[in-house]
Regions:
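Cofactor-binding active-site loop characterized by glycine-rich and histidine/acidic residues
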Residues: 41-199, 217-235, 498-500
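Glycine/charged-rich beta-loop-alpha catalytic/anionic-binding loops adjacent to active sites
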Residues: 47-53, 117-136, 170-176, 211, ...
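Short beta-strand segments
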Residues: 82-84, 140, 146, 178-179, ...
Length: 710
């Protein structure tokens, strides 16, 4: 029932008074009571075995009613993103206590993460239960991937219905996103809600409000609760429920799920609940909560409430005691099974960092006969166009890539006109959503290409990149690699200034679980773009703005013959740009330059002064690195310069120098030289200052001279 922007729950059986008991309702209550008994006994068992349950965990004590009510609504074709306190919800969705306990104790048979992640951090593709992608601990971060799943479902529903999982009667899927009240103040929650409303996505945001965020009370941390906050989001339906009352919770969740399943629009459910357990096993309630506060919360315990309802319906005290005893015996037996299960084999610790790459060898024709020359920006454009033509599950979105502009560098020009606004479209200025939504899109089978407009503005998306995307494959034990291609224009290009000229590769390369490519010419741009899209893992493609049109002097060779449509360059393979003369190498008169991006052109220009004495390697991929090519080249020449556009101190270039010296020490005739930008906080807008800061052919030439003379 709707009034304005709010929902008033009703039962399917109609508006009945609490004293009227439809026949099916008692069975529902008994099922909920059994699950509640199991959840309560699980929490008690963990508390009684603290030395065994040594890894940090939270339980649902106090939240059981709303969680069970929510979990009961979901079907195997639905999706969910529970948060770390949702073990009752997991039980209601059909997961067993043993499965949860195996994760609690970090056992090898943990079905979610293989002993790698915390309790109630599920990742499941079980066909008989809702789809649950990798869940992180970062509060509120799951809201963006959850909305991304809804975004993907909506796309499949409208345009690729054969690829969408639906119910036996054609029931459409929904996404349930569960979160605590303390996480609602995260800015990324707002980004997700805006997107869900704007695009009319089928997602339920369930906020469980116990008025505590670890030791911070609600009056310390917010001016309004989630229900009041949601009033400011035009078009977001909302409701309040008493999350400690199973009947009210079930009615509310039933209404919310029914609405979203039919209307395909988002809903917020604000459930008030008591917090009866600890924040976590490591942050105990008695450390920061008063006896008065604890007693107030205890009065709202959902367990005696449901028990009283069942007694009133005619269930006997003995029947309920039997259910409690049954739960106790069952949980104790399951805990014993989990306790004696095997720990993970330490030799598996490196498994599932990435899914196997799809492209492992160079394919297609790099320089077809009579082929036309193409600039890098157009090579990228054509690559994406060919991808969209071949793969209907591919979409492309980001700031200004849609109709009208087609990218601030015209790198997406005409794509929306050719493929429609449902496949190529603009987003708001929300880097976190652009990046993080791809985790959800990938989970449901959509293959996103997204763009961050400038490398300098990627940082708001780092939460999602680090907590959700990079760890997903590893912590889901290979079940949820995130297939996403993130395009990032990068680098200085003459007067771009401090917020449009930055280089960020060293920062990106500290994140494990992502791949980073950096083409320096049109052919590699196209070949790497194809391989990056096909890779089942997250790939960031750094695209140098100064090379897009080859307007920077000395970069004309970035324009190449356009490769065939099937051309692919495997990630992790470098390229020899310039070879030294073998005779000079034998005489010890040569050196090599290891570089990428704009460095290729600085190195090439400088090497002209030393014909036959310089070999240049273009890395093309920064991770995974072509170590074999690098080490073999350095060992052959004995002298090496690593050249980067980045500020040098603590950079990827310096780290690579250390690795080379470790692996090639016996072959070196000189220390590894490095050259990069001056260690300044930003690239100045004045072009004379920019030129002074950055490397250039003259600086490279001087360093080659010193290196050869060493």
């Amino acid at each position: 029932v709707f009034k304005d922007n709010t929902i008033t729950p009703t039962f399917k059986a109609g508006n009945v008074s609490p004293n009227e008991q439809p026949a099916d309702r008692k069975g529902l209550w008994l099922h909920a009571f059994r699950l509640m008994c199991q959840a309560s006994r699980m929490a008690a068992t963990y508390e009684a075995n603290r030395s065994i349950c040594k890894y940090v965990h939270s339980t649902s004590r106090g939240h059981e009613a709303i969680q069970i009510a929510a979990g009961m609504q979901l079907q195997p074709w639905d999706c969910a993103t529970p948060y770390y306190r949702d073990d009752s919800m997991m039980l209601a969705m059909g997961f067993t206590p043993l499965e949860l306990m195996l994760q609690l104790l970090a056992k090898t048979d943990d079905p979610f993460s293989g002993g790698r992640s915390y309790y109630c951090h599920p990742g499941s593709r079980a066909l008989d239960r809702p789809l649950i992608p990798h869940q992180s601990s970062a509060t509120g971060m799951q809201v963006i991937p959850a909305t991304g799943m809804a975004q993907g479902i909506r796309y499949l529903e409208k345009h690729l219905s054969d690829s969408l999982a639906i119910g036996p009667e054609g029931e459409l899927p929904v996404v349930l996103c569960s979160l605590g009240d303390g996480s609602v103040t995260e800015g990324e929650v707002s980004e997700a809600w805006q997107s869900a409303i704007l695009w009319e996505l089928p997602v339920i945001f369930l906020v469980q409000d116990n008025e505590w965020g670890i030791s911070a009370s609600s009056d310390e941390t917010r001016v309004m609760d989630a229900y009041e906050y949601a009033a400011g989001f035009k078009g977001l339906k909302r409701m309040r429920v008493d999350g400690s009352d199973f009947e009210d919770s079930y009615a509310g969740m039933e209404a919310a799920v029914s609405y979203v399943r039919k209307e395909r629009k988002p809903v917020l459910v604000h459930a008030t609940v008591p917090l009866l357990g600890h924040h976590t096993s490591g942050v105990r309630k008695e450390w920061y909560r008063s006896e008065e506060d604890l007693s107030i919360h205890l009065e709202k315990d959902p367990f005696p409430k449901l028990k009283a309802r069942l007694l009133k319906s005619g269930v006997t005290e003995k029947e309920l005691l039997d259910i409690e005893k049954e739960a106790q015996d069952y949980i104790e037996a399951e805990f014993d099974k989990a306790r004696i299960s095997q720990d993970p084999d330490p030799r598996t610790v490196k498994d599932h960092v990435f899914a196997p790459a799809a492209v492992t060898t160079e394919k297609g024709n790099r320089s077809p006969e009579n082929g036309a020359k193409v600039m890098m920006v157009d090579a990228a454009l054509h690559a994406v166009e060919e991808i969209l033509q071949q793969y209907p599950e591919a979409i492309f979105f980001g700031q200004d890539v849609g109709r009208r502009l087609g990218g601030v560098f015209r790198e997406a020009a005409t794509l929306a006109e050719k493929f429609g606004d449902h496949r190529v479209y603009n987003t708001a200025i929300q880097e976190a959503y652009i990046i993080g939504s791809t985790a959800g899109l990938s989970a449901v089978g959509v293959k996103p290409i997204v763009e961050i407009q400038f490398a300098d503005y990627i940082y708001p998306g780092f939460n999602q990149l680090v907590t959700e995307i990079s760890k997903s494959c590893y912590l889901s034990y290979g079940k949820f690699p995130v297939q996403t291609l993130i395009r990032v224009p990068i680098g200085a290009y003459g007067g771009g200034g401090p917020y449009h000229s930055g280089s960020i590769e060293s920062t990106l390369l500290t994140i494990k679980g992502i791949k980073v490519v950096y083409p320096s010419n049109a052919a590699d741009m196209k070949g790497l773009m194809k391989a990056a899209f096909l890779d089942p893992n997250p790939v960031i493609m750094l695209e140098h703005k100064g090379l897009y049109w080859s307007k920077v002097p000395g970069t004309q060779s970035a324009i190449t013959i356009e490769p065939d449509a099937d051309y692919q360059v495997p990630l992790g393979k470098g390229r020899v740009v310039l070879q030294a003369h073998p005779k000079d190498t034998q005489k010890g008169k040569t050196c090599c330059i290891i570089t990428y991006g704009m460095g290729v052109y600085w190195a090439t220009a400088a090497a002209a002064a030393y014909p036959g004495q310089v070999e240049i390697i273009d890395l093309r991929t920064l991770f995974p690195l072509d170590e074999e090519l690098v080490y073999q080249t350095v060992s052959r020449h004995g002298k090496c310069l690593i050249l980067t556009e980045e500020q040098l101190n603590n950079s990827f270039a310096q780290a690579l120098a250390g690795r080379i010296q470790l692996h090639c020490f016996r072959s070196l005739d000189a220390p590894i030289f490095t050259l990069g930008a001056l260690d300044l906080p930003a690239v100045p807008i004045n072009m004379a200052l920019e030129n002074e800061m950055l490397p250039n052919p003259q600086k490279v030439k001087a360093m080659i001279k010193d290196l050869l003379a060493y």
